[in-house]
Amino acid sequence: MVNDRLYICYCDNGYILIDNTINPYCLLINGSTSPNTTTTIIINNTSNNNNNNNNNHMNWTIPIVIIVSIFILLIIGSISLYLYKKYCSKPKRVHYQLIR
C-alpha cells in the first residue's frame, strides 16, 4: 500500500472526475452519481495513473522537440552563412586589384 494515492473525486453530470478526466475506478468505489458531490477516496496505482503520467510526459515532450529543432536549424543556418561568406563571396578590393 505504499503506492496508494489520495484522490478528490468530483461528480459532474453523473460521471466521477479525477483531475478533469473520467475515472471508472473512482466511479466504482464511490457509487454516488448525484451532481455536485465531492468525496475523498484512496486508490492504489492503477492503469489510469500510468496514463496520466504518460500524458504529462507527452505535454512536455512536444515543446522540447520544437525548441531543439529550432536551435538545430539556427546552428545549421549560421554555419552555412559563415561558409558562404568565407568561400563564395568575392571581396571587391581584390577584384579591382586584379583588373589593374
Curated annotation (Swiss-Prot):
It is found in: Membrane. It is a single-pass membrane protein. This is Putative uncharacterized transmembrane protein DDB_G0291932. One of its GO terms (cellular component) is membrane. It comes from the Eukaryota. It comes from Dictyostelium discoideum (Social amoeba). Keywords: Membrane, Transmembrane, Transmembrane helix. The chain crosses the membrane at residues 62-82.
